[in-house]
């Protein structure tokens, strides 16, 4: 990227960064260059505490923080005094596991390198240090590490490699079929198997391009390196006049009539406030400190904004995003995949649920999807999307199993919606836009700068880009389900000459239906494993980041079969 020269490596590299690099250069880059943090079981569950502390060990240690400008390393070091006086010391690490039985000495290279780097820091500051100590709490054994010349040379070379990686701002390639990935909690961020598969394909969209072709549509069975769904869930506050307060480690939501409910903050992924709902400052600050976003909507469901503590530290991704957005050709290449995927998913929804659909409609949608994938301009792509949308919405009403004319659907309308179906569609599109906004922000993107939707004041263009392929799969599917299952009826809506509004109780039903859909596990059409739709959004966002960074050639839209 053109701005790379303006981003310099840190003057001092943490010694723990060297152990991360020794274990997996890609994990090191994700953690230190992109600012993503997740405790890695394989690298650190059998390793030292996150800060290298040995406070809970029986060793007589004192902890100091030293830097070595000449070496270019800084570290928090646990010191054990040797027999040679106060300047004769040993660096020490506390491990939660036990010595490795499969290797000589019982200590893996990442920890040997970290200890050696600490010793070099000590030596530059006038200490004597020829060996280190690792205490394994599970087995209560202490293992000595000698700082011989080969280890010192390996450590110095690794310092140079880490500095070069930080200066180049290029993510190292993922490991291939490595056992290290199996228990690494960076798996959902790194996506090693997914990236390796896509890099093997000449065309990142080719496997997803086949609508009926069983060969092209065949998925690969990849390792499940990411959780299938989140343990944390969104919390929605819809009742007007409600207040949200902090109560210990919980949030208390109190309605206007005095009824109160609590939810543990550890279980919350995001807090969504609709209309006239107030939140106290202590509650807001606590959520900010926990990096839990607070999202504000109008009473009608229009997404207004977000309150969040610190956003992603991945400035490299945002710089590359702005570079891509300025390049119309590269932006168009992304937009083609997104819109083509959207049209294919529209076709799938109709094919599955409209049993009387003319074959001509499916053929035309397939043609439009192909044309979108090869569009030569934004104007042409907009035209193709518009024609496909008109055809799709002309058949969407056929999916509704109701004889009530007031619940019929004859086409898309909005601002204000003039029938209940369109009212629910608009409401769900607002929730889905919020979901994409939060996901993109967490990955490190700027949600207001898109590639297909052009920048406009207050419009989350990239969130709208990402949600295109999920409109039929999530929002439209939920609408059909809610009306066909009689969860929503005419009495749930306020129908006037000016438009249609959703009643308060109906909004709860809509949100519940949306959350059921987002929590549904689906087999990924390309990678073969089962994950929830909410997790799919994150995977797609991270794949988009891999395209922006140059790791994979094309964006693989999520298309079901």
Where do the protein language model's features map onto the residues?
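Charged, glycine-rich intrinsically disordered N-terminal tails and low-complexity linkers that flank
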Residues: 1-68
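Immediate flanking context of iron-sulfur cluster ligation sites
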Residues: 13, 160-182
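Local cysteine-cluster metal-coordination motifs and their immediate loop/turn environment
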Residues: 23-26, 179-192
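Short cysteine/histidine-rich metal-coordination sites, predominantly Zn2+-binding motifs
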Residues: 38-42, 197-211
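Active-site helix-to-loop segments that bind/position phosphate- or nucleotide-bearing substrates
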Residues: 46, 63-67, 209-247, 254-256, ...
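Mg2+/Mn2+-dependent nuclease catalytic core
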Residues: 57-161
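A surface-exposed, charged beta-strand/loop segment in the N-terminal or early-internal portion
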Residues: 80, 267, 273-348
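Metal-dependent nuclease catalytic cores in nucleic-acid-processing enzymes
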Residues: 107-133, 290-294, 430-438, 472-477
